[in-house]
From Swiss-Prot:
InterPro entries: Papilloma_E7. The keyword Hydrolase does not apply. A motif (LXCXE motif) lies at residues 22-26. Highly phosphorylated. Belongs to the papillomaviridae E7 protein family. It comes from Human papillomavirus type 16. This is Protein E7. Keywords: Activator, DNA-binding, Early protein, G1/S host cell cycle checkpoint dysregulation by virus, Host cytoplasm, Host nucleus, Host-virus interaction, Inhibition of host innate immune response by virus, Inhibition of host interferon signaling pathway by virus, Interferon antiviral system evasion, Metal-binding, Modulation of host cell cycle by virus, Oncogene, Transcription, Transcription regulation, Viral immunoevasion, Zinc, Zinc-finger. SUPFAM superfamilies: E7 C-terminal domain-like.
Amino acid sequence: MHGDTPTLHEYMLDLQPETTDLYCYEQLNDSSEEEDEIDGPAGQAEPDRAHYNIVTFCCKCDSTLRLCVQSTHVDIRTLEDLLMGTLGIVCPICSQKP
């Protein structure tokens, strides 16, 4: 702006409308254990995988075992259900014993 009073042509901007994709590809956590499929711009999106540290005990000698796994959120819940049930993990020493 030049001068003491603004003029209209100084405020006229040369703006062009832009096209924007308004579809949200965000996946929300569902309270059920079913995994929903996401349709993304390139088809179906891969579920996010993360690293999980698991600390458990040997089912024979009760020594502490540490595991690091890479899994989806749904699959790690399945593993948790198995570990809380009848599935037991054996340490390397106990696995050598008959």
